[in-house]
Curated annotation (Swiss-Prot):
PROSITE patterns linked to this entry: AA_TRANSFER_CLASS_3
Cofactor: pyridoxal 5'-phosphate
Family as reported in the entry's similarity comment: Belongs to the class-III pyridoxal-phosphate-dependent aminotransferase family. HemL subfamily.
Family matches, as InterPro entries: 4pyrrol_synth_GluAld_NH2Trfase, Aminotrans_3, Aminotrans_3_PPA_site, PyrdxlP-dep_Trfase, PyrdxlP-dep_Trfase_major, PyrdxlP-dep_Trfase_small
GO BP terms: chlorophyll biosynthetic process; protoporphyrinogen IX biosynthetic process
Compartment annotation: Cytoplasm
Name used for this protein in its record: Glutamate-1-semialdehyde 2,1-aminomutase
Record carries keyword Cytoplasm: yes
Transmembrane segments annotated in the record for this chain: none
Upper classification of the organism: Bacteria, Bacillati, Cyanobacteriota, Cyanophyceae, Synechococcales
A cellular component annotation (GO) from this entry: cytoplasm
Signal peptide span: none
CDD domains found in the cross-reference section: OAT_like
Record-listed N6-(pyridoxal phosphate)lysine modification sites: K271
């Protein structure tokens, strides 16, 4: 690991990519617009490490944005995939692997009695929204400022006070008529949710949220918040939906609902359950899921849904996670990391607020607490950009945005954690004087 990395090939490839793909990327955050500097182009990944096309090695705390909880290219996962690929890459028909992964998900996640596999978290959230409306016969849905549920039109609603509840679109091309039924509230604010129910009697199909917000940084639920949502939705004949695409199988084997002891009506999943391959899922009570076609009238379909390679990687990943001591290790290393980051910042006189839950962590460069998206936006984005660039040039790969959670894996050991803390200390010392 060196202090200054040569990224000439990355620069050349990214320059060419900008003529071929919008912004040079297949997903916006990868373009480094939030942090400045030049994106790196990956060549390979293994364990807790990533190597770019120039041969530089990084300690990786993105993990493909969450799926790589066992570490990149875990040998048991890759071996299983090598065996599976000999049988074909896609069936477009039922296969026993779907049954096996479905049974594992149902056994693990408290709310899930029946599950449908799709191809992404966005797909899962799109489908669950349609199902919420069909089951309740109501059109409106409550989401929270800063919570991300994929790029479907209904969820791309501007966050913030004033315009939030008016349903103004957050992207050109999204009609106001589409978002008019999306109501928003600040995360961790039960009174705001009560007000929305009061103002929209018998009109709200349900409440959807990230039980731990990972797409506005890292924000945890205040004591009583999730429990309060469960009570409010039940009282108003609405559904409670946990978007566990990020938290599912990451913060505990049964996800956030197991961790916090609050069971929603429906759950969306993704990332970890595909072991690094494209996948999503939604599930819940049989009474609700039985409305999904072909059992019921709520249509949803997909050419690659239940793909045998994704099912194979997911099964092996969950088998690894179910082993004794898995989440204890993840909690220990992640706690060690965030405590070291916070201590390093404080030692250098830099304001910081952060935390972790199992294999998920985050921090804001501001005074805390951070309980919602408005408070998250007090983060010093300019300073974070400087920090990100300094960390990168010293071989530590953080999410290129102050509004994304970080991830550890079973492949991260004390050696990588301690080296990372050392690099944070160096970088905080550097940027405090810039």
């Amino acid at each position: 690991m060196t202090d200054i990395l040569n990224c000439t090939k990355s620069e050349e490839i990214f320059s060419a990519a900008q003529e071929l793909m919008p912004g040079g990327v297949s997903s916006p955050v990868r373009a480094f617009k939030s942090v400045g500097g030049q994106p790196i182009v990956f060549d390979r990944v293994k364990g807790p490490f990533a190597w770019d096309i120039d041969g530089n090695r990084y300690i990786d705390y993105i993990g493909s944005w969450g799926p790589a909880i066992c570490g990149h290219a875990h040998p048991e996962v890759t071996t299983a995939l090598q065996e599976a690929i000999e049988k074909g890459t896609s069936f477009g028909a039922p296969c026993v692997l779907e049954n096996k992964l479905a049974e594992m998900v149902i056994d693990a996640v408290p709310s899930v009695e029946m599950v449908r596999f799709v191809n992404s978290g966005t797909e899962a959230c799109m489908a669950v929204l349609r199902l919420m409306r069909a089951f309740t016969g109501r059109d409106k849905v409550i989401k929270f400022d800063g919570c991300y549920h994929g790029h479907a039109d209904m969820f791309l609603v501007k966050a913030g006070s004033g315009v939030a509840t008016l349903g103004l679109p957050d992207s050109p091309g999204v009609p106001r008529t589409t978002t008019a039924n999306t109501l928003t509230a600040p995360y961790n604010d039960l009174e705001a949710v009560k007000k929305l129910f009061s103002e929209n009697p018998d009109a709200i199909s349900g409440v959807i949220l990230e039980p731990i917000v990972g797409n506005a940084g890292f924000i945890t639920p205040e004591p009583g918040f999730l429990e309060g949502l469960r009570e409010l939705t039940t009282e108003n004949g609405s559904l409670l939906v946990f978007d566990e695409v990020m938290t599912g199988f990451r913060i505990s084997y049964g996800g956030a609902q197991e961790k916090f002891g609050v069971t929603p009506d429906l759950t969306t999943l993704g990332k970890v359950i595909g072991g690094g391959l494209p996948v999503g899922a939604y599930g819940g009570k049989k009474e609700i899921m039985s409305m999904v076609a072909p059992s019921g009238p709520v249509y949803q379909a997909g050419t690659l849904s239940g793909n045998p390679l994704a099912m194979t990687a997911g099964i092996k990943t969950l088998e690894l996670l179910k082993q004794e001591g898995t989440y204890e290790k993840l909690d220990a290393i992640t706690s060690r990391l965030i405590e070291g980051i916070i201590q390093s910042a404080e030692n250098n006189g830099i304001a910081i607020y952060g935390g972790s839950v199992s294999a998920m962590f985050g921090f804001f460069l501001c005074d805390g607490p951070v309980r919602n998206f408005d408070e998250a936006k007090t983060n010093d984005a300019k300073l974070f950009g400087k920090l990100h660039r300094e960390m990168l040039r010293r071989g530590v790969y953080l999410a290129p945005s102050p509004f994304e959670a970080g991830f550890t894996s079973l492949a991260h050991n004390e050696e990588e954690i301690d080296k990372t803390i050392e690099v944070f200390d160096q970088c905080f010392n550097t940027i405090k004087n810039q």
